[in-house]
Amino acid sequence: MDILLSILDATWKVIFIVFFFGFCIFIHEFGHMLAALWQGLHVERFSIGMGPVMWKIFTWRNVDFVLSWIPFGGYVALPQLDATDSPKTMQDEKLEPCKPWPRAVVAFAGPFFNILFGFVLAFIMWGVGLWENPKASSCIISSVPQSLPDYEKELSITDRLVAFDGEPTDLFADEICAKLEPGTTHSVTVKRGDKDVTFDMTTLANPEWEAGLRAGDRIVGVNGKHFTKGYEEFSMEYVFSGAYKVTVNAIRDGKPFDATYIPLRNPLMEGLGAPFFTATSPVALGGVHPNSPAAMAGLQAGDQLLQLNDTNIMGGKEFLELLAKMDGAPFSLLVTRNGKDMLLEGIRCPAPYTLHNFGAFFAVSVSSVVPDLPAKKAGIRRGDRILSVDGVEVLDSKQITEYIRSTEGKPMTINLVRNGKPLELKGVCSEKVEMEGGAVYLLGVTLSNSAPKVIGHPNPWAQFTRIVSQTWRTLSLLFSPITSRVTGRERGQATVKVEHMSGALGILTMMWYTLSSEGLRGGFSLIILITFSLAIMNLLPIPALDGCYILFSIIEIVIRRRLPYKLVNALVSIFFYLLLALIVYITFFDGRRIFRLLKFGSIKGVPPKVEKVTPDAPPAAQEKQNEQPVETKEEK
C-alpha cells in the first residue's frame, strides 16, 4: 500500500511539472502564432510538444497543428521572421519579407502571453492564498564565529575532520574555528577515502565579528532598509545588496548600532555573500492560557518575543532564564504582533518560573513531514505545534531534537495543538537512520522555532512587481562587472554570479521539492514566478531573444530601411550558440547541486554532522502534507 501511495504521489508531481512547466513555453509560442495570424504573416506549423512530428491533428487557416514526440512545450514555425531577404515556405514557395511593425508585434506577443498567463494564475492564487512567512520586523543572531576556516587552499567544505592539533575530533572546521583567534595556524587531519591527510591551516578573521556583531543582537535592517518577513527577507536583502560594504542595523541592550564591513564569499553557500553568523526570526508564542499572567499582560498567540526589559530574547530557554532572574519583580516585554512592535509593561510571573505557570507555550511548529518515517506514520502534520514530549515542556526545536535522540527508539507521548485543538499521540518511536558519518535517531519532521508559515493573499500586481524586482536585482548583479567599470562604483566580490542561476534542470528539481514541501500552493507560486520570469528574460535586447527582434524593428522604423540581413543573421547565430553554451554551463552547476543533494543531503555540498542533525529531512525527502495553515486575509 505504501509503495502504491508513493507511486501515486510521484505521478501527480510529474504530471503537474510536465504540464504546467511545458504550458509556460506553449502559451509563449501560442502568443507568437496568434499575433502572426493577426498581422497576416504566414504560419507554417504550430506544434504541441517538441521534436519530430508524431501526428498531424488538423489544419486551420493554412496552419498545420501537429503533435510532436516530446510532450513538453511547443513551437511555431514563422519563416518570415528568419533573417533573410527571401523567406520561403517548407514547399519552397517565396514569401514577402516581414515589415518592422508586424515583426515587433509578433515578437512582443510571446512574452505578453506569458504575462497574461501569469496574471490569470496570480488572480486565482489571490483568492486561494499563497504560503508566506509570518510578519517579523527583526531577527535574532544566535551565533557569530570569531574566525573562519581557509577553504581557498587544501581544506574542502566536504572534508570531515578526524583530528585537530593532534586531538581526535568529529567536528567540522567551521565549528572549531568559530572560537579560535584569527591568524593562528593549526594542524588539521581529514578523512579522504581510506586515507588520513594532514596539513596546516591558518584561521581567517570573520569581518562580522570584527565589526562588532555578537550572539543575542537583534537585527532590524540591512543597509538602512527595514524588513517585514524576518530572517528570510533579511538574508535575501543581504545577499542581493551587491554593495562593496554591507551595514547591518541592530539593537543591543535596547540601544541601536550599526555594524559595517566588507562581506566575504561564503563557501558553504556556493560563494555567495551570505552571512557566516546564524540568525532566526524571533521566538513566537503558540498560545496563551486564559486568566494566566501571560493573558492578563495582554499576550496573544503568534506574538513574537523581542526583549524582556532591555535584553534581547534569543529563544524559549533564554526567555525562561530571564523570567527566573526577575524573581517575581515586574518587567516589560517588547513583542511584535502582526508586523507591529508593542511594549507590554507591568508583567509579573509568580514562582515557579515555568511556561505553564506563566500561562503560555511556544510555537515550535512542524514545517514538513518526511514520508516513511515515524512522524508520518503517527499522523503528525505540517502546521502542528508541539507542546510537550513525555510531559517535558517544549522550549525550542533543539531541545526536542536532543530528547528524541536520547530515547533511542523508545515509545514517546507527544502533545500538540492542531487548528487550536489539543491532541495527544502515544507510542511514537524514533527510527535509527544511517547518514553520512554515522547513524542518528530521527522522528522525521522539520521543526521551526518561529511562527509557522501563513496563507497570505497578495494581489496579482503585488505578485508581479515582486518577481520583476527580484529578476531586475539578479540581472543587475550579473551585469555588475560591466556596469561597475562604466560607473566607477566599487562592487562587492561576494555577489551573485552566473553559476548561481538555475536552468531547466534546476527549475524542475526546485519544482519537485516545492510540491513535496508546500503542495499545490507552492507549485503554482513557482509557476507564476517561472512564467513572469520567462517573459522578462525574453524581452532582454539580446540577439536570439524576442527583445532583440523588437529592438531591431524599432531601429528599422527610425532609419526607414531594413538592417543588413547578413549582419542580423550573424548576430542571431553567434548569440544563439552563446546562449546554448550558457545553458550547458548553468546545467553543469545544476547537476552538481543535485549530486551534492543526493550524496550529502545538502544542496550546498556539506555533509550533515550526526551530532547536529535535526529531525529534518533533505528537501528531496519532504512530501506534500495536509495543510493546516494560519489564514490571514490581509491584501498587500
Question: Each predicted region: which residue ranges?
Answer:
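Small-residue-rich helix-interface/hinge motifs
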Residues: 8-90, 537-559
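Low-complexity, proline/glycine-enriched hydrophobic segments characteristic of transmembrane helices
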Residues: 139-218, 334, 343-345, 406, ...
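Conserved PDZ fold ligand-binding element
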Residues: 151-170, 211-231, 294-316, 377-397, ...
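PDZ-domain C-terminal substructure recognizer with occasional recognition of PDZ-binding tails
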Residues: 178-206, 214, 220, 236-275, ...
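Internal alpha-helical transmembrane segments
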Residues: 27, 74-143, 254, 319, ...
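Functional transmembrane alpha-helices
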Residues: 2-4, 8-10, 93-101, 270-296, ...
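Terminal peptide-recognition signature
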Residues: 28, 67, 150, 158-161, ...
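PDZ/PDZ-like groove recognition
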Residues: 121, 125-163, 195-215, 269-301, ...
